[in-house]
């Protein structure tokens, strides 16, 4: 199946939602579905579903809809969920510790296999309840190379984010999910995604305010 490589960011961010919905439909023994049903399950409009899917060629057939099993397999391959992806975590502060206890593998094929923090951190040398080892930052290059890890989660203070990100790239990391509220300057081949909790909360509050305005206008 051929499809456009440069899909919009908004569409890319919905891919995991589509995959989750098709897995749910499959568990519920639903054989085929429609853009309307998909849209209702996600909370968007059917036109958005059809537009998103159009970037990937003919995913459905007019008059039939979408084959659930076929689309579940398609999105699994698209999101590389047919093979286990090893992930390293750098920074075991509040966010990092929470992520260490998040059971990634129960929901998909991602596996958090190791964590790092400053060499003098009291947690260095220990393991989590799930047997995830915590190493000192000085071991980052050797340990990541041993496990051939290409993906990392970065949850360090902003002032250290650039320095640590460069260490990760030198160690062979090709994709970073960054929780630090700072723009990283890294080689073009490194894929970056940012999670800004403050920004997300502000966006939530904005939509709550707009919803309140709409209710008042309808009263």
UniProtKB/Swiss-Prot annotation:
NAD(+) binds at residues 91-96. SMART domains: CoA_binding (SM00881). GO terms for biological process: negative regulation of DNA-templated transcription; response to redox state. It is found in: Cytoplasm. Gene3D superfamilies: NAD(P)-binding Rossmann-like Domain (3.40.50.720), Winged helix-like DNA-binding domain superfamily/Winged helix DNA-binding domain (1.10.10.10). The keyword Cytoplasm applies. Belongs to the transcriptional regulatory Rex family. This is Redox-sensing transcriptional repressor Rex. It comes from Streptococcus thermophilus (strain ATCC BAA-491 / LMD-9).
């Amino acid at each position: 199946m051929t499809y456009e490589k440069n899909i919009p960011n908004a569409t890319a961010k919905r891919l995991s939602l589509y995959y989750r919905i098709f897995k749910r439909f499959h568990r519920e023994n639903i054989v085929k579905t429609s853009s309307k049903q998909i849209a209702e399950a996600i909370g968007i409009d059917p036109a958005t579903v059809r537009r998103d899917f159009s970037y990937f060629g003919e995913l459905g057939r007019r008059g039939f809809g979408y084959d659930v099993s076929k689309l579940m397999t398609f999105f699994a391959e698209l999101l590389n969920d047919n093979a286990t992806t090893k992930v390293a975590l750098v920074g075991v502060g509040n966010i990092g510790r929470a992520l260490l206890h998040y059971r990634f593998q129960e929901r998909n094929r991602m596996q958090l296999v190791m964590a790092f923090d400053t060499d003098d951190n009291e947690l260095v040398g220990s393991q989590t309840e799930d047997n995830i080892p915590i190493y000192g930052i000085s071991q980052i290059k050797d340990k990541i190379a041993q496990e051939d890890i290409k993906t990392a989660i970065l949850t360090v203070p902003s002032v250290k984010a650039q320095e640590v990100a460069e260490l990760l790239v030198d160690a062979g990391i090709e994709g970073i999910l960054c929780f630090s509220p700072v723009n990283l300057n890294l080689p073009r081949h490194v894929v970056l995604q940012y999670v800004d909790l403050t920004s997300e909360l502000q966006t939530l509050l904005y939509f709550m305010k707009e919803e309140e305005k709409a209710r008042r206008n309808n009263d």
